[in-house]
């Protein structure tokens, strides 16, 4: 296996993610059966004899969570004419809840019922979830047939309550490399629990390429004629890969291995292309062969905790707080990002005339940017570059010139959704550097980082991911599992977790924490939040009580988690 190790070593780079902190001054749904056309959903009870129209209609919406055989379970609730005309593949709308209201003018044989709900998302082809925020209103005609109520007229498409989606679909990651080839990026897909061959379903999704949302930020190196032909002779079989070189084959094998492993499909894995092992001389691969690219290695990484108080950054360890020397101990730090692995820090200094400075955590610094306002800095993967937003609307990327070795800055083009205006108050890159999260006028958005040309960056496909928070968001941080931690000004529910695809936002325990939550951070084992009174911590495992951080009791400071 020595040769395999050499190949992976040539592709990888050191894992490095920074910690940061500040104190304020229309697609079709699928069961995703792929190669198993006979997959069946669980047994679904049909219409209850004698059911009233509203009860029958709710049964229809519950049955919509089972799309097998062209929504056969749902069709049992339709009249013959409605069954012929209904196209369930038009779109799958996900709503928070479905409310029913019978319209005036009902007769013994006909009822018109209006359905209403807040549309929170759509579930598209390939199991891709896209967040939405709009009102759904539609009319459904019920008719009595043979003394039983049935649906006689309804809009095309499917409406799912969010709880039904979560009960019957499970999110899995399909992995693609970032443009540098250094890190795997998860592309979240919702796959129906009734699928009988999860591995072949995932393979088909992998070959099909990244979702339209994520595609601008990742690479897909498979030839256009590539296809997955199934699992046979104990191996996953692909065709159309003959033009791929050895490095491309290893990259694809790495995607396959980690996709299957994190879907809890046990290895080792035999992967063949055009009748031969995908990677020459290694017909069977395990996660140990490509361990350098484990996309979840970060979840168990050892971190260092720092605090920011009164402009001074301190190291926090075993209840002891030690102020740093160098520029981070100068007393004028407003916000900071630290990478202990790369021995680099970036800080916004000065309140009246903010400057972005870069240097060793306990050394000297270089000023790289001045502006009226500068957001908390954030590092790309492996600390290859630094980002911050100047004056509320201009993302700036700072990197070291390969020719002069000087620090240079370039503006990043950012494409906001139509109608979205206001200052960007928070901006943070994900661990992979492929996603960006931001707060604009108290609302949380997420976008994809693009590379139009070498040295050039952009942020596109920006969507709001937590509309339930309204305009209350104040702070955010990426968690190790890829979700977002969001601090808010909401008195009852001050801190939230937001899923990476916007499919959900859930409040974290609020015991002993008081809004506003002006700073948040997260390590593999602990969540940190600065509320109205102090810096608090909560174990990432089940717990409901926030406690003060030893060494910082009664102190209102911000946590900085660094790797």
From Swiss-Prot:
Pfam families: Gmad1 (PF10647)
Cellular localization per UniProt: Cell membrane
Keyword Lipid metabolism: no
Lipidated residues (S-diacylglycerol cysteine): 20
InterPro entries, alphabetized: GerMN, Lipoprotein_LpqB, Lipoprotein_LpqB_C
Lipidation (N-palmitoyl cysteine): 20
GO CC, alphabetical: plasma membrane
Annotated signal sequence range: 1-19
Keywords for this protein: Cell membrane, Lipoprotein, Membrane, Palmitate, Signal
Topology in the lipid bilayer: Lipid-anchor
Family: Belongs to the LpqB lipoprotein family.
NCBIfam families reported for this sequence: PRK13616.1
Protein name: Lipoprotein LpqB
Species per Swiss-Prot/TrEMBL record: Corynebacterium efficiens (strain DSM 44549 / YS-314 / AJ 12310 / JCM 11189 / NBRC 100395)
């Amino acid at each position: 296996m020595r040769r395999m190790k050499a190949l992976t070593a040539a592709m990888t780079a050191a894992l490095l993610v920074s910690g940061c902190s500040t104190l304020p001054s229309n697609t079709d749904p699928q069961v995703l059966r792929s190669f198993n056309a006979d997959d069946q959903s669980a047994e679904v009870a049909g219409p209850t004899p004698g059911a009233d129209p509203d009860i029958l209609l709710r049964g229809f919406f519950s049955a919509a969570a089972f799309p097998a055989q062209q929504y056969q379970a749902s069709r049992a609730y339709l009249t013959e004419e409605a069954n012929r005309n209904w196209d369930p593949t038009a779109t799958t709308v996900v709503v928070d809840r479905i409310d029913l209201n019978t319209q005036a003018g009902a007769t013994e044989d006909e009822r018109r019922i209006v359905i209403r709900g807040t549309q929170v998302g759509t579930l598209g082809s390939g199991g891709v979830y896209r967040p939405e925020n709009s009102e759904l209103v539609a009319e459904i005609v019920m008719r009595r047939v043979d003394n039983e109520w049935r649906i006689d007229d309804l809009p095309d498409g499917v409406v799912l309550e969010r709880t039904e989606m979560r009960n019957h679909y499970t999110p899995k990651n399909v992995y693609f490399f970032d443009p540098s080839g250094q890190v795997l990026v998860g592309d979240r897909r919702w796959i129906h629990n009734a699928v009988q061959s999860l591995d072949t379903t995932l393979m088909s999704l992998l070959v099909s390429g990244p979702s339209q949302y994520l595609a601008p930020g990742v690479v897909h190196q498979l030839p256009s004629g590539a296809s997955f032909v199934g699992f046979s002779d104990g191996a996953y079989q692909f065709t159309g890969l003959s033009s791929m070189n050895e490095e491309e084959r290893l990259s694809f094998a790495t995607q396959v291995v980690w996709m299957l492993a994190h879907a809890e499909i046990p290895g080792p894995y035999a992967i063949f292309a055009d009748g031969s092992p995908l990677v020459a001389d290694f017909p069977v691969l395990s996660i140990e062969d490509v361990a350098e690219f484990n996309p979840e290695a970060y979840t168990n990484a050892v971190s260092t905790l720092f605090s920011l108080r009164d402009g001074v950054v301190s190291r926090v360890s075993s209840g002891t707080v030690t102020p740093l020397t160098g520029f981070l101990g100068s007393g004028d730090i407003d916000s900071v990002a630290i990478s202990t692995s790369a021995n680099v820090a970036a800080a916004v200094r000065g309140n009246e005339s903010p400057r972005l400075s870069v240097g060793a955590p306990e050394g000297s610094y270089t000023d790289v940017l001045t502006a009226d306002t500068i957001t908390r800095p954030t590092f790309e993967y492996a600390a290859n570059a630094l980002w911050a937003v100047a004056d509320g609307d201009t993302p700036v990327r700072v990197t070291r010139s390969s020719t002069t070795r000087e620090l240079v800055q370039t503006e990043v083009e950012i494409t906001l959704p139509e109608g979205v205006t206001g200052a960007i108050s928070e901006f943070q890159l994900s661990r992979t550097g492929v996603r960006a999260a931001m707060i604009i006028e108290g609302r949380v958005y997420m976008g994809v980082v693009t590379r139009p040309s070498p040295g050039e960056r952009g942020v596109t496909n920006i969507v709001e991911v937590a509309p339930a928070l309204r305009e209350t968001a104040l702070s955010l941080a990426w968690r190790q599992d890829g979700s977002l931690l969001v601090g808010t000004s909401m008195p009852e529910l001050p801190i939230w977790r937001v899923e990476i695809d916007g499919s959900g936002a859930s409040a974290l325990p609020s015991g002993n924490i008081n809004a506003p939550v002006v700073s948040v951070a997260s390590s593999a084992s602990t969540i940190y939040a600065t509320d109205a009174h102090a810096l608090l911590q909560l174990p990432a495992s089940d717990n409901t009580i926030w406690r003060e951080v030893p060494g910082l009791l009664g102190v209102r400071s911000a946590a900085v988690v660094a790797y």
